[in-house]
């Protein structure tokens, strides 16, 4: 018993010494608090802007290195991402900004600051508290004023969705942004017709020609050589005048990272430990002799399961709005294959119409849809006689393409029109 007490006492002493040393390390680190707001010009310069009815909003999401430089601390380490806002209230009334609409899990300034407090540095801790507090975005927007600050949101990679809501007396204005986040390379940022089709005439289609053109496209994606059919091209997105990514990121979709050494290592790690990897790369598929322009996905808690969409910008517009053709399918697991470099591939669910319907519902729930319809073009395949993709996974479909027209402003479900085009299987005449 005496020996046990002696060992216990020694263990307590060692633990106390460890705590003292750790506290000293934290304290020393806390004195190195050196924020540099002078570098904010970089993210302010790339801020996106929207305006309506006397209100002008600018927004920018900070990357990991930008936030560490500006705030003097590694906020990303704790899953925190500042979003810079500037709101000009050019009206005659005081307005109010509601930060919870941008990020329901946003952090308070004291909550952020406390994560970097030192054990023996009350003065430095107080300086941190004041610094983070003074930089938060105020909620009150005086008449004829410009108000700036930060919302301490949850960390996102690739694209950060920002829903900015400003309220006044009998008025409500909303501004939606899909803000690029500096850092890793992603598939889908900065895609423009001028860069994809340099020197080409982009033809604007009316509704009848749009339907015919979309139905005339090939059934499927291709391999890099253009010889073999891959997943079916079962999706078309007609963007609004705004950013086509907004409806997707508003519903929790993430851009996929480009396939490089870093993303391969992270993919292998997530696969071994069955971890979540929200921005994992997708294998390339080809349309117009090029791989996808945009790759989006919604992942579950394991890298093995996700729904993903690939999009290609077409050389056409509708009412001067970009037209994207693509495919949507769902990964339901992983299997061995000799068709890929790492001898494994995701297995897709065979009912690709289910995934098409899921995407339609998701976009409808975003509110950013003005109308939708279906066109021919994929070609039907039954469950008893399915087609296969490039890695041999079978799939069946009614053969139709979903065509979704996006809207700049949110709409209620009752305001969204369905075009009287083709009717997908599973919908009766009453759906017409």
Residue ranges with predicted function:
Residues 67-82, 90-94, 140, 225-226:
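Short, solvent-exposed beta-strand/turn "edge" segments of beta-rich domains on protein surfaces
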Residues 88-93, 156, 240:
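Short solvent-exposed strand-capping/beta-turn motif centered on an Asx-Ser/Thr pair
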Residues 217-247:
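Terminal, regulation- and interaction-focused segments at domain boundaries
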Residues 93-101, 163, 245-249:
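Short, hydrophobic/aromatic beta-strand segments
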Residues 90-142, 147:
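The feature marks short-to-medium sequence segments in extracytoplasmic or secretory-pathway proteins
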Residues 29-31, 136-199:
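Surface-exposed edge beta-strand/loop patches
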Residues 81, 88, 259-430:
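A cross-kingdom signal targeting lumenal/periplasmic-facing segments of multi-pass membrane
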Residues 37-76:
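Low-complexity, acidic Ser/Thr/Pro/Gly-rich terminal tails and inter-domain linkers that flank the onset
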């Amino acid at each position: 018993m005496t020996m046990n007490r002696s060992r216990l006492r020694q263990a307590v002493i060692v633990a106390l010494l460890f705590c003292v040393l750790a506290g000293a390390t934290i304290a020393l680190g806390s004195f190195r608090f050196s924020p540099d707001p002078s570098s904010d010009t970089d993210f302010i310069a790339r801020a996106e802007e929207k305006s309506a009815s006397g209100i002008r909003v600018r927004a920018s999401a900070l990357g990991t290195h930008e936030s560490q430089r500006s705030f003097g601390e590694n906020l990303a380490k704790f899953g925190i991402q500042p979003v810079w806002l500037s709101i000009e209230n050019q009206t005659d009334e005081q307005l109010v900004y509601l930060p919870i609409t941008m990020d329901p899990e946003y952090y308070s300034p004291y909550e952020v600051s406390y994560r970097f407090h030192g054990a023996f540095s009350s003065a430095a801790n107080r300086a941190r508290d004041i610094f983070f507090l003074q930089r938060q975005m105020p909620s009150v927007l005086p008449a004829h004023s410009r108000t700036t600050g930060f919302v301490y949101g949850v960390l996102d990679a690739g694209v950060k969705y920002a829903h900015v809501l400003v309220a006044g007396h009998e008025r409500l204005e909303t501004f939606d942004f899909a803000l690029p986040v500096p850092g890793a390379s992603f598939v889908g940022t900065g895609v423009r017709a001028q860069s994809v089709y340099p020197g080409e005439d982009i033809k604007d289609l009316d509704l009848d020609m749009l339907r015919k053109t979309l139905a005339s496209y090939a059934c499927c994606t291709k391999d890099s050589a253009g010889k073999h059919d891959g997943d079916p091209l079962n999706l078309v997105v007609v963007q609004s005048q705004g950013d086509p990514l907004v409806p997707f990121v508003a519903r929790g979709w993430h851009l996929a990272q480009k396939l490089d050494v870093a993303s391969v290592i992270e993919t292998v790690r997530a696969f071994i430990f069955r971890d979540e990897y929200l921005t994992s790369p997708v294998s390339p598929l080809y349309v117009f002799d090029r791989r996808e322009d945009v790759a989006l996905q919604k992942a579950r808690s394991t890298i093995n399961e996700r729904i993903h969409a690939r999009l290609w910008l077409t050389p056409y517009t509708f009412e001067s709005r970009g037209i994207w053709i693509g495919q949507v399918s769902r990964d339901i697991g992983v299997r061995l294959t000799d068709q890929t470099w790492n001898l494994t591939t995701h297995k897709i669910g065979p009912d690709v119409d289910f995934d098409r319907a899921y995407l339609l519902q998701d976009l409808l729930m975003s509110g950013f849809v003005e109308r939708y319809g279906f066109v021919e073009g994929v070609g039907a395949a039954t469950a008893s006689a399915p087609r296969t993709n490039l890695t041999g996974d079978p799939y069946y479909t009614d053969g139709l393409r979903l065509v979704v027209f996006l809207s700049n402003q949110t709409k209620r479900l009752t305001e969204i029109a369905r075009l009287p085009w083709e009717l997908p299987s599973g919908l009766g005449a009453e759906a017409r």
